[in-house]
From Swiss-Prot:
Its EC number is 6.1.1.22. GO terms for cellular component: cytoplasm. It comes from the Bacteria. It is an enzyme of class 6 (ligase). It catalyses: tRNA(Asn) + L-asparagine + ATP = L-asparaginyl-tRNA(Asn) + AMP + diphosphate + H(+). The gene is asnS. Homodimer. GO terms for biological process: asparaginyl-tRNA aminoacylation. This is Asparagine--tRNA ligase. Pfam families: tRNA-synt_2 (PF00152), tRNA_anti-codon (PF01336). It is found in: Cytoplasm.
Length: 461
């Protein structure tokens, strides 16, 4: 079966030949004795022009087709006599599968992104979101391709977990208990031993802890899947459900980790630019002017590197008045991250060696006993897109840190076993897939790069 993509990519092979196409009406113009249909079949960003003339058996019915109607076209592919396209199909027969209801909400006019979020089940049919979600598909493939080409094993991490990988407690709890009759312990706490799994369980915030177990068997591994955060951050950069790519490398320190992250980012950007030229041209023209310049700057330059302490000094000396005051020990806010990436370095930059008190329990302690071997990658226009660290591989230091943070060792027994049975230096990071999508496309809101966004007070569709 020939697709619209075949016509755009290999049109000369089908020129002056009879072809058959299936698809949806994107636009229709009726000129009384002839008409034009822009047909899109989902295989390509652009649609192909169908010319139908008065001699068509069901000309009147075709002339009255509405946007989103589904049809089958038989005709000849010819060189176009008009401007706007090189090739078009002269229809000999058009079969109508269904004439769409005239109340179809996405007529041929500009709609705001806010409005289209209320029509998430239909918005992939628009030019913008067709481009967004096609790039999302290609980007996901590029990530798998990068890791497979570099001999990483793909691991499926569980969605349901009994531990908190971040130690932050911002998790969605899973339960089958009757909320009107919750079993309680003598001390008044919920008795989760009566629950489905016999213990308290949650949706995962990260696949890292499980992934590390496979790192000890397969050396270099990665997982790619949904993660969940129950934090009330109603911003353009946060979602309650999002996807993360998480690699772990055995016998690699934080410097090897940064090299991997930089190679990955450059690989996936180039892959998408090479394989989605029409979509990326659309984003460059209509979503973010200068997008190509920004992405080529990433491809053609080494990423910056700065320690957290140096970053604080840069921010303090900037002379810029920040909403959140700068001092050593704070967690960098979006405004700080963007200043570093956009105004100071003017390119992606790694920030390393953060204070231990603002990072997760599993990060390796530096010799100063104040900082850990953590790294974040900050990108212009969006801030943090990658967060990672060298992992603490010393059993005593890890358990000491867990006690300091009040974590229950029993919940992490399998994780601690890794430090008892053949511990080894290793490192890993997480790439926020949607953040990368925003950076690649210029889209400004995370809700517009996820098919069905989940945010506080919103779980439609």
């Amino acid at each position: 079966m020939i697709t619209v993509k075949d016509i755009f990519r290999h049109g000369e092979d089908y020129l002056d030949k009879e072809i058959e196409l299936f698809g949806w009406v994107r636009k229709i113009r009726d000129q009384k004795k002839f008409g034009f249909i822009e047909l899109n079949d989902g295989s390509f960003f652009k649609g192909v022009q169908i010319v139908f003339e008065e001699g068509l058996e069901n000309f009147d019915e075709v002339s009255r087709l509405s946007i989103a109607s589904t049809i089958k076209v038989k005709g000849t592919l010819v060189k176009s006599e008009g401007s706007g396209q090189d090739l078009e199909v002269k229809a000999k027969k058009i079969e109508i599968f269904q004439k769409a209801d005239l109340e179809y909400p996405l007529q041929n006019k500009r709609h705001t992104f806010e409005y289209l979020r209320t029509k998430a089940h239909l918005r992939a049919r628009t030019n913008t979101f067709s481009a967004v979600f096609r790039v999302r598909s290609v980007l996901a493939y590029a990530l798998h391709k990068f890791f497979q080409e570099n001999n990483f094993a793909y691991v499926h991490a569980p969605i349901i977990t009994g531990s908190d990988a971040e130690g932050a407690g911002e998790m969605f709890r899973i339960t089958t208990l009757d909320l009107n009759k919750v079993p309680k312990k003598e001390n008044g706490e919920v008795d989760f031993s009566k629950d489905f799994f016999g213990k308290s369980t949650n949706l995962t915030v990260s696949g890292q802890l499980n992934l590390e177990t496979f790192c000890a068997a397969f050396r270099n591994v990665y997982t790619f899947g949904p993660t969940f955060r129950a934090e009330y951050s109603n911003t353009a950069r946060h979602a309650s459900e999002f996807w993360m790519v998480e690699p772990e490398i055995a016998f690699g320190d934080i410097f090897a980790l940064m090299e991997l992250a930089e190679a990955m980012v450059k690989y996936i950007i180039k892959y998408v630019m090479d394989n989605c030229p029409e979509e990326m041209e659309f984003f460059n023209s209509f979503i973010e002017k200068g997008l190509f310049d920004k992405l080529n700057n990433v491809l053609n330059n080494d990423f910056g590197r700065v320690t957290y302490t140096e970053a604080i000094e840069i921010l303090e000396k900037s002379g810029k008045k920040f909403e959140f005051p700068v001092k050593w020990g704070i967690d960098l806010q979006s405004e700080h991250e963007r200043y570093l990436a956009e105004e100071y370095f003017k390119k992606p930059v790694f920030v390393t060696d953060y204070p231990k008190d603002i990072k997760a329990f599993y990060m390796k302690l530096n010799e100063d006993n104040k900082t850990v071997r953590a790294m974040d990658l900050l990108a212009p226009g969006i801030g943090e897109i990658i967060g990672g660290s060298q992992r603490e591989d010393n059993y005593e230091l890890l358990t000491k840190r867990m006690k300091e943070l009040g974590l229950n060792e029993e919940d992490y027994e399998f994780y601690l076993d890794l430090r008892r049975f053949g511990s080894f230096p290793h490192s890993g990071y997480g790439l926020g897939f949607e953040r990368m999508m925003m950076y690649l496309t210029g889209m400004q809101n995370i809700r517009d790069v996820i098919p069905f966004p989940r945010t506080p007070n919103n779980a439609e569709f």
